C-alpha cells in the first residue's frame, strides 16, 4: 500500500496488529510491527497539539486537517512476540496514533469537527471509483 501505516482490520484481518514505515520529525525512517498496541500521549504542559492534513488508506485521496499530540509512544509485541516500544515525533507520532485508533474502532474522521468530516467523506466519494476494489492492498502488492 502507499501509506505510512496499515492496520490489520483495514484489510479484513481481525487482529490488533499494525505495520508502519514512516519518517519522524527528524526525517529518520522508522519501521515496525506492533501487536496489541498500548498508546501513551503527553499530558498537561507537555501536551502540544500539531494540526496537519491527515489521510487514510481507507479513504483514499481524501485529506483534512486533524489535531493530534506532537509526541506519542506505543508499546506492544513485535511479530516474534517480543516486547517493543516506539517513540514518535512529527509524522511518526501521528502515524502511531492513527494506526492504534483503527484497531480500537476509531477512524481519523471521527477526530475532526462535523463540517470537516462531511467534506472529507464527500471528497472520498468523488475519488473512490479511481481506486481498485481491493484497496488498500491490491494483488500487485504481492507480485
Segments predicted by a language model, with ranges:
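Positively charged
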Residues: 1-143
Amino acid at each position: 500500500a502507499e501509506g505510512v501505516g496499515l492496520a490489520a482490520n483495514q484489510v479484513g484481518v481481525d487482529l490488533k496488529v499494525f505495520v508502519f514505515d514512516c519518517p519522524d520529525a527528524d526525517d529518520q525512517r522508522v519501521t515496525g510491527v506492533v501487536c496489541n498496541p498500548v498508546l501513551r500521549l503527553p499530558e498537561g504542559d507537555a501536551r502540544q497539539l500539531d494540526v496537519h492534513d491527515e489521510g487514510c488508506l481507507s479513504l483514499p485521496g481524501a485529506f483534512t486537517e486533524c489535531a493530534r499530540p506532537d509526541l506519542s509512544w506505543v508499546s506492544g509485541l513485535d511479530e516474534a512476540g517480543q516486547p517493543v516500544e516506539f517513540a514518535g515525533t512529527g509524522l511518526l507520532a501521528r502515524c502511531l496514533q492513527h494506526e492504534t485508533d483503527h484497531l480500537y474502532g476509531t477512524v481519523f474522521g471521527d477526530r475532526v469537527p462535523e463540517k470537516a468530516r462531511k467534506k472529507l467523506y464527500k471528497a472520498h466519494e468523488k475519488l473512490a471509483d479511481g481506486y481498485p476494489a481491493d484497496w488498500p492492498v491490491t494483488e500487485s502488492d504481492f507480485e
